[in-house]
Design a protein with these regions (language model features):
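An N-terminal assembly and electron-transfer interface module characteristic of large anaerobic redox
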Residues: 1-386
Length: 386
């Protein structure tokens, strides 16, 4: 038997021998979650799962290499008040699509695969950011390697410096007050323009009505006030090279507290944030999603801690797309959140090495003179003692 994937519904580990087998055969391992409560209770629970049940359902399967801790089963009550565990219908549909999408990555030619890569960038001319990484050169190296592996990345510039210039021009992020820069971008930056009909069809496919109402209550009707055109469309910044698209991750909330906006607010994300991910799923039709560097805000959007339901933002924004996250090996805690809340398969990168620092210019000269002075003073004392 040579399976392409294994779906393990048992709790706990499968063991080291099984891990060796999975590695040798390059077999995907999925461990969907069984919720030990009624569907309605679970959907309202902000934790999703906790304690020993979480350990045996999520933590230990991760040791075996299981990915995508996707809540699939929950309890239903019959007419006599007896509980039975069944697959949640809407979850089952998404789970099957997800498995098929992962398997397609093994069979689809690289030249036909569509990949969406999100990066993190401050407003205006701010540089791309990621903890412990030079982002633009690293991103360029990835694109070059993908091109060598047969991916369609037409139009890739000759070097990382040129890529950086293109990102500043076409993949920018704007403050809400930067109207001049925004207007210039809409004319010259080649944004993806999303219409009301497109957006609402994607929303209908991905979000429950009450979930979308949270967005309208917070930010008004589509397109909102940010990145909106005069004719009622929404602009999404992106650079497209053949079948690969690079996109900035927009702010997941509003306000001046950037730490809180990134690390989680209680509000629904704005239209621009949602539209970007829904376009990735339904417009661009990505075969794979990559978040590049540590870290973004997707894994911190509301609501549940783990065992997400179809009413939680990360679950809806990732959809059934295989998700890969280039993440620092030095940030284990938040990396686990990315794995469990945004269904990311983590690809670790090393933290930068520590080097001994030296002082600069005139300060180095000053340090040398202080050292000479101290040594000469010590020599005089030694002579006096003799």
């Amino acid at each position: 038997v040579q399976p392409d994937a294994i779906i393990n519904m048992a709790h706990g580990r499968m063991g080291d021998k099984m891990v060796d087998y999975l590695k040798a055969k390059n077999i995907l391992l999925f461990a969907p979650l069984t919720i030990n409560s009624l569907v309605d209770e679970w959907e309202k629970d902000p934790m999703g799962m906790a304690g020993g049940f979480m350990s045996q359902s999520i933590v230990t399967p991760e040791i075996d290499g299981a990915i995508r801790p996707f809540a699939l089963f929950a309890h239903y009550e019959d007419e006599e008040g007896l509980r039975h565990s069944y697959a949640v219908p809407e979850r089952l549909k998404t789970f099957v699509s997800t498995i098929n999408n992962y398997l397609n990555l093994n069979t689809k030619p690289n030249s036909e695969k569509k990949v969406a890569i999100y990066y993190y960038k401050g407003p205006g001319q701010n540089a791309l950011t990621a903890a412990g990484m030079e982002v633009v050169p690293s991103l360029y190296n990835l694109l070059v390697r993908m091109k060598q592996e047969g991916y369609n990345i037409s139009g890739l510039p000759a070097n990382a410096e040129e890529l950086g210039k293109m990102i500043q021009a076409q993949g920018a992020v704007f403050n809400s007050y930067a109207e001049g820069a925004f207007n210039d971008f809409m004319q010259k930056g080649h944004p993806e323009l999303i219409t009301k009909d497109q957006y609402e069809s994607w929303v209908k496919e991905s979000l429950r009505p009450e979930k979308y109402q949270e967005v309208v209550d917070a930010f008004g009707e589509f397109p909102g006030s940010y990145m909106a055109t005069n004719d009622g469309k929404l602009g999404i910044a992106r650079l497209q090279f053949g079948n690969v698209v690079l996109m900035p991750q927009n702010a997941a909330g509003s306000g001046d507290n950037s730490f809180q906006v990134i690390h989680g607010t209680n509000m629904a994300p704005p239209h621009t944030y949602i539209a970007s991910y829904l376009w990735m799923q339904h417009g661009f039709k990505a075969d794979a999603l990559i978040h590049f560097g540590t870290h973004g805000s997707l894994e911190f959007t509301p609501r549940k801690q783990v065992a997400l339901c179809s009413n939680d933002w990360p679950d809806r924004l990732v959809g059934a797309v295989p998700h890969f996250y280039i993440y620092s090996i030095g940030n284990v805690g938040e990396g686990m959140m990315a794995k469990r809340r945004s269904y990311a398969t983590i690809q670790s990168y090393l933290t930068p090495p520590f080097l001994e620092s030296s002082v600069r210019g005139i300060y180095r000269e000053l340090m040398e003179k202080i050292k000479i002075y101290n040594n000469s003073h010590k020599e005089n004392k030694d002579q006096e003692s003799l």
